[in-house]
Design a protein with these regions (language model features):
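PEST-like low-complexity, intrinsically disordered acidic/proline/serine-rich tracts
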Residues: 1-117
Length: 117
C-alpha cells in the first residue's frame, strides 16, 4: 500500500495506491478503503484529516493521523499568519513497549526557497 500527500493551493490532496481520494458517502460519513493487505487495516478521510491503521505479523499496530492545519484569516489590516502546515501523528503499540510510543511531526511552511537548503 502506498500513500502520496501533496499540498496544492492551501488544500491537501491524498492518493492511496495511486488512486485519488474517493468521494464521501451521501450522508457525509468519511469514505473508507478496506484492504486485503494484512499490513493495512483501514484508511478513512474526514474533512482535511486522513486516518490510517497498519498492523504487521509481529503484532505491531501503528495508528496514523495526517491533518492539514489552516490558520484563520487575518483581521483587517493585519499581516496574514504563516501556514498552512501538515501535521502527522503516529501512535505505535507493541508487546515490547510498556506504553504506546507517540510521535508528532509538523511540517512548517518555508519562508523562501533558501530555507529548503
Amino acid at each position: 500500500a502506498s500513500l502520496a500527500i501533496t499540498l496544492e493551493e492551501g488544500a491537501v490532496h491524498f492518493r492511496f495506491d495511486d488512486r485519488p481520494r474517493p468521494p464521501l458517502y451521501t450522508d457525509g460519513r468519511p469514505s473508507v478503503i478496506d484492504s486485503e493487505n494484512p499490513v493495512l487495516r483501514f484508511a478513512a478521510w474526514e474533512r482535511d484529516t486522513l486516518y490510517v491503521e497498519r498492523t504487521n505479523n509481529s503484532g505491531t499496530r501503528i495508528e496514523e493521523q495526517w491533518r492539514l492545519i489552516t490558520p484563520p484569516p487575518p483581521r483587517e489590516g493585519a499581516e496574514p499568519p504563516p501556514g498552512p502546515w501538515l501535521e502527522a501523528r503516529f501512535l505505535v503499540r507493541n508487546a515490547l513497549l510498556e506504553e504506546p510510543l507517540e510521535l508528532r511531526l509538523l511540517a512548517e511552511p518555508l519562508k523562501d526557497a533558501t530555507d529548503a537548503l
